[in-house]
């Protein structure tokens, strides 16, 4: 018993029909890039409240009308909340060790900040290409 090839591989017409529109791709890219804008405006790269306000606003406005923006907005929001949690934990470690923890926390803050910047830019590029990007090491708090 053999399976016809057209039942295994989706046709080009089906894959194009499922692709997000240019408008959805653009809004999804804005959801990711708004975290960068929030970081610039608040001066808190990676862990500040400004980093998740932009993705939250875009997600809340577009989630019901644009499925791709719903997915990528949640992803951007979850990633920025995860990074903020990591920064709070590092801050608490510093406070609890009366500053001695800075030996560990400063390099970790730098590494997490650089990773945040790189992953955010990659996500924006992928969203603009219509790819559903998943950030690594992200807590999926908003489903």
Task: Give the ranges of each region predicted by the language model.
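Amphipathic, cytosolic membrane-interfacial segments at TM-TM junctions
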Residues: 61-84, 125-135
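Membrane interfacial helix-start motif at the N-side
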Residues: 16-22, 26, 34-38, 65-80
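Residues at secondary-structure transition points
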Residues: 21-24, 47-51, 63, 67, ...
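A generic hydrophobic-segment detector
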Residues: 117-143
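Hydrophobic transmembrane alpha-helices of multi-pass, membrane-embedded glycosylation machinery
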Residues: 54-59
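Low-complexity, intrinsically disordered extramembrane tails and loops of integral membrane proteins
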Residues: 1-24, 140-143
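Intrinsically disordered, low-complexity boundary segments flanking structured domains
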Residues: 15, 46, 124-128
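Hydrophobic alpha-helical transmembrane segments in multi-pass membrane proteins
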Residues: 28-53, 78-120
